[in-house]
Design a protein with these regions (language model features):
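An extracytoplasmic/periplasmic, membrane-proximal ligand-sensing/linker region
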Residues: 30-32, 175-176, 216, 223, ...
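Extracytoplasmic/secreted proteins, especially bacterial periplasmic and envelope-associated proteins
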Residues: 47, 51, 55, 77, ...
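Short beta-strand->loop
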Residues: 112-122, 158, 180-184, 202-203, ...
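Hinge/capping helix and adjacent helix->loop/strand transition within the periplasmic-binding protein
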Residues: 84-90, 104-191, 240, 245, ...
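Short, low-complexity disordered leader/linker segments with a strong preference
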Residues: 1-30, 142, 324
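Short secondary-structure boundary segments
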Residues: 96-97, 134, 208-209, 227-228, ...
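N-terminal (or domain-start) structured segment
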Residues: 22-116, 154-156, 162, 178-203, ...
Length: 324
């Protein structure tokens, strides 16, 4: 009798919770939603976040979706703030590759990427490319590797910033090809591209959209794309993966929220975001950024993030990369 009483009580509790959770998801959001952007206003991630916020607000009947720009410490400032927010789905981080790379190079983060966050949805990806100064002799990955192997000094390359996705793409090439290259640090894509165009640095891993106008102008040349397939607007140029199997490097924006958010809320958030980013309105407003807009489920994003973290940990360890 006692056991049946316990079972009955548990069933009543479950029945009492389920409608409440469903109601919570149906009513979401019940207060302003805040999207934390780990960069200053005006950059590509900020622009994507503002377009997303505007269209999410419209989908939610005009309920406010606010942008909080919190740059600093290689995105750690904003990430730590979100990690400590109430786990109710009303606070989200507009995550970039740094969310996955930082754990590989910094072992004293004020948060645990895998434990302190719940995945919501991808927003968009951008392909990465290896480009070179127009006067640099090699024009393919194989020729770059051959040049590096015969050069008495390591080849220099650059990226938009140290310990970012472009930097680690170069480290991955070094490891896969067995060559020596030295990363030249810049603070941002624009100054790095300027010096590659000027011939001060021969090679650069950058977002294809950022480098493309220089390639189109004949100031740079595309060595290879780091995406799964050849670029639609440069289909004559091979991918990195055609030489080194599995060599794919993608810049991304995704949404994560503090761990512990109710599952029905996560599912509603993800479904609404997927609906927005797949809409013609969102794609029309973001097409000038050169992004591939798409969403996925919390489970899909979480699985992808785990794979990416493991990959960057392997690359960073082999390169002995550590945060300052």
């Amino acid at each position: 009798f006692a056991m049946r009483s316990v079972v009955f009580a548990l069933l009543m509790t479950a029945l009492a919770v389920s409608p409440s959770q469903a109601q919570t998801a149906a009513d979401f959001p019940t207060s302003p939603v805040r999207l934390f952007v780990p960069f200053a206003a005006g950059g590509p991630t900020d622009v994507v976040a503002r377009i997303l916020a505007e269209q999410l607000s419209a989908r939610w009947g005009g309920k406010p979706v606010l942008i909080e720009n919190r740059p600093g410490a290689g995105t750690i400032v904003a990430t730590a703030l979100v990690a400590k927010a109430p786990p109710n789905g009303h606070t989200m981080l507009v995550a970039t590759n740094s969310l996955l790379i930082n754990p590989a190079i910094n072992h004293s983060l004020p948060y645990d990427t895998l434990k302190d966050f719940a995945s919501v949805s991808m927003i968009a990806t951008q392909p990465v490319a290896l480009v070179a100064n127009k006067s640099f002799a090699p024009s393919t990955v194989q020729e770059v590797v051959a040049e590096a192997k015969k050069s008495p000094a390591p080849l220099n390359y650059t990226s938009p910033g140290p310990r970012g996705v472009g930097h680690l793409a170069g480290e991955m090439l070094k490891q896969r090809a067995g060559i020596e290259m030295v990363h030249i640090n810049y603070n941002g894509s624009a100054p790095a591209l300027t010096d590659v165009v000027a011939g001060r640095v021969p090679l650069m891993f950058d977002i294809w959209h950022s480098a493309k106008r220089y390639v189109d102008a004949g100031q740079l040349k595309l060595i290879a794309g780091a995406s799964a397939e050849r670029f639609a607007d440069a289909s004559n140029v091979a991918t990195m993966a055609e030489t080194y199997s599995g060599f794919q490097v993608t810049a991304f924006n995704a949404l994560v929220t503090p761990a512990g958010a109710p599952q029905p809320v996560l599912e509603k958030l993800s479904a609404d975001i997927r609906a927005v980013v797949s809409s013609d309105a969102f794609r029309e407003k973001t097409k000038h950024l050169g992004i591939n807009a798409y969403g996925n489920t919390p489970a899909e994003l979480s699985a992808w993030m785990r794979t990416e973290i493991a990959r960057w940990q392997e690359v960073a360890k082999a390169a002995n990369l550590q945060a300052n």
